[in-house]
Swiss-Prot record:
Pfam families: Herpes_UL95. It comes from Human herpesvirus 6A (strain Uganda-1102). This is Protein U67. Belongs to the herpesviridae UL95 family. It comes from the Viruses.
C-alpha cells in the first residue's frame, strides 16, 4: 500500500505519475483518468463534509480511497449511561397533547407533488422506501424513551469529533420523536378509529431515524431539518411543560434558526407529519388512480414494508419506463388488516402477523 506522505495540505496531489511508475507502467491516458477520478472524488467528499480532514490512501493497482475520522461502533459497558432530564416531559406527553381533533366523516385525499399533463401518461417513481416491521412498530410507540436513550448513549461517546452544531441533543430528539408536532396532523388519522387508542398516531419518519450507531452526521442532520421544519413557527406558550424545559426548547430553536438562516430546508411540513397508515392510504389512492387512468403523471417514492408481505393484497405494475427495460411497481396494502393486526399494550407496539 502506498501512502502520499508528502502531501501536507488538504488539496490532493493530482500528479500521481511519480508514485505509480515504481509499481506499474501507466500510460498517459491512464494517468489522466486516474487524476480526474481523484479530483472528482475529492470534490464529492468536500461537498458532503466540507469541514472534514481527509486522507488519501493509494494502492499500486490504480485504486484509492479518502478516509476521515472513524466513528466508534458503540460504547463500552463502563461508560456512564445518559439519562433523560427533560423535566418529565415524556411522562406528561399524553396530558400535554391529549386534545382530540375534530373528525371528518369522509376521508379527504389531496395529491401531493403531482404534475398533470395532457401529452404524457407516465408514473415517475423515485427510490422505494423500505421499512421493516420493527421500523413500523418503533414509529408507532408513544413513549420512545428507550430509543432516545440508546441514541444518546452512542452520540455522546467521548472523543467523538463534532458532527452537529446543536448543543442540546436530548431536547432535539425529544421534539422529533415525542413533541407536539410529532403526531399525525390528519383530522381523520387512523389512530382515532383504533379501539383502545383513540388518538393520532405518531408521524412516520425515515427508517434511518429508527436506528442508531451509523452515521451521526447524517442522522442528526436529518433530525435537525425535521425539527426546524415543524417547530420554527410553533407557539410553545400553551404547553404544560416546566419553564426550564421551555427555555431549553427556545435555545434549541435559536440554534437551528441560526444554522438554517441562509438555507432552504427541503422537508415538507405537511407531508412529513403523517403516520404510516395515512401515508399508505394516500399511496393506495395514488396507485389506484394511476391504474384507472385518472392520474396522468405522478412523482413519488412508494413505501415497501419488507416483512409484512401477507398484508399486501395487490401490485399494480405501470408501463415500461421510458428508455429502460424496467417498470415501476406500486403496492396496495390492506390497511384494515394491518390496523387489525396492530396490538398496543403498555410500553410496547406489535404487529400480530
Amino acid at each position: 500500500m502506498w501512502v502520499m506522505s508528502q502531501v501536507r495540505s488538504m488539496e490532493p496531489d493530482l500528479t500521481l505519475a511519480a508514485v505509480y511508475q515504481a509499481a506499474a507502467n501507466l500510460t498517459e491516458q491512464d494517468k489522466e483518468i486516474f487524476a480526474e477520478a481523484v479530483k472528482t472524488a475529492f470534490s464529492v467528499c468536500s461537498s458532503a463534509a466540507p469541514s472534514a480532514r481527509l486522507r488519501m490512501i493509494e494502492t499500486p493497482t490504480q485504486n484509492f480511497m479518502f478516509v476521515t475520522s472513524v466513528i466508534p461502533s458503540g460504547v463500552t459497558s463502563g461508560e456512564k449511561k445518559t439519562k433523560l432530564n427533560i423535566d418529565a416531559a415524556l411522562d406528561n406527553l399524553a396530558l400535554s397533547f391529549a386534545n382530540k381533533k375534530s373528525k371528518k366523516m369522509a376521508r379527504t385525499y389531496l395529491l401531493q407533488n403531482v404534475l398533470r399533463t395532457q401529452d404524457q401518461q407516465v408514473a415517475i417513481s423515485g427510490k422505494y422506501i423500505l421499512y421493516t416491521k420493527k421500523h413500523i412498530e418503533t414509529s408507532l410507540m408513544i413513549d420512545k424513551t428507550k430509543l432516545v436513550k440508546k441514541i444518546l448513549e452512542y452520540a455522546e461517546t467521548p472523543n467523538l469529533l463534532g458532527y452537529t452544531d446543536v448543543r442540546d441533543l436530548e431536547c432535539l430528539l425529544w421534539l422529533v420523536f415525542c413533541g407536539p408536532k410529532s403526531f399525525c396532523q390528519s383530522d381523520s388519522c387512523f389512530g382515532y378509529s383504533k379501539t383502545g387508542y383513540n388518538a393520532a398516531f405518531p408521524n412516520l419518519l425515515p427508517p434511518y431515524l429508527y436506528e442508531c450507531g451509523q452515521n451521526n452526521g447524517l442522522f442528526f442532520g436529518i433530525v435537525q431539518a425535521y425539527v426546524f421544519s415543524w417547530y420554527s413557527d410553533f407557539d410553545f406558550s400553551a404547553l404544560e411543560i416546566s419553564e426550564r424545559a421551555r427555555r431549553r426548547i427556545r435555545s434549541l430553536l435559536y440554534d437551528l434558526k441560526q444554522k438554517f438562516a441562509e438555507q432552504e430546508v427541503s422537508v415538507l411540513s405537511v407531508a412529513s407529519q403523517m403516520c404510516i397508515f395515512c401515508a399508505l392510504y394516500k399511496q393506495n389512492k395514488l396507485s389506484l388512480e394511476y391504474v384507472s387512468g385518472d392520474l396522468k403523471t405522478s412523482v413519488f417514492s412508494p413505501i415497501i414494508i419488507k416483512d409484512c408481505l401477507c398484508a399486501q393484497t395487490t401490485i399494480s405494475t405501470t408501463q415500461m419506463l421510458p428508455g429502460t427495460k424496467s417498470s415501476a411497481i406500486f403496492p396496495v396494502y390492506d390497511l384494515r388488516k394491518l390496523l387489525g393486526a396492530l396490538v398496543i399494550s403498555e410500553g410496547s407496539v406489535k404487529f400480530d402477523i
